[in-house]
């Protein structure tokens, strides 16, 4: 069975993805990347939700320090703008994808569905390979 890493938020889109991926023949491993602002009890709730929906395993990773050191400080110093208008401070998605790829390597799988994108779930964007 092919393994896939799904970046899991517990929201509608990622909650749909777990049973859908299982139906498509994948062994689903979920990952929640905590970039700050979520309690330990909320993390536990996300873990339980992922398992209840059918995930084989769930992992929580805290990247609060990495977000500050590797993303926010350099972006603030750069003055970078998104679409020449908005400060580029919503860049935690890069850490989410990075942690997802690490888990892919640990599981020896090449399938990933990071989801943190500016679009609603569309099957044509599904299941990227590492």
Question: What are these regions, as identified by a protein language model?
Answer:
Residues 1-130:
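ATP-dependent adenylation/nucleotidyltransferase module used to activate substrates
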């Amino acid at each position: 069975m092919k393994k896939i890493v799904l970046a899991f938020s517990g929201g509608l889109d990622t909650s749909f993805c777990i049973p859908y991926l299982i139906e498509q023949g994948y062994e689903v491993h979920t990952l929640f990347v905590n970039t700050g602002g979520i309690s330990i009890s909320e993390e536990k709730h996300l873990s339980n939700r992922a398992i209840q929906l059918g995930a084989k395993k769930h992992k929580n990773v805290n990247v609060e320090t990495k977000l500050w050191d590797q993303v926010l400080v350099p972006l603030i110093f750069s003055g970078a703008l998104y679409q020449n208008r908005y400060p580029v401070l919503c860049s935690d998605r890069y850490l989410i994808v990075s942690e997802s790829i690490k888990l892919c390597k640990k599981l020896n799988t090449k399938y990933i569905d990071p989801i943190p994108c500016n679009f609603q779930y569309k099957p044509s964007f599904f299941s990227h390979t590492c």
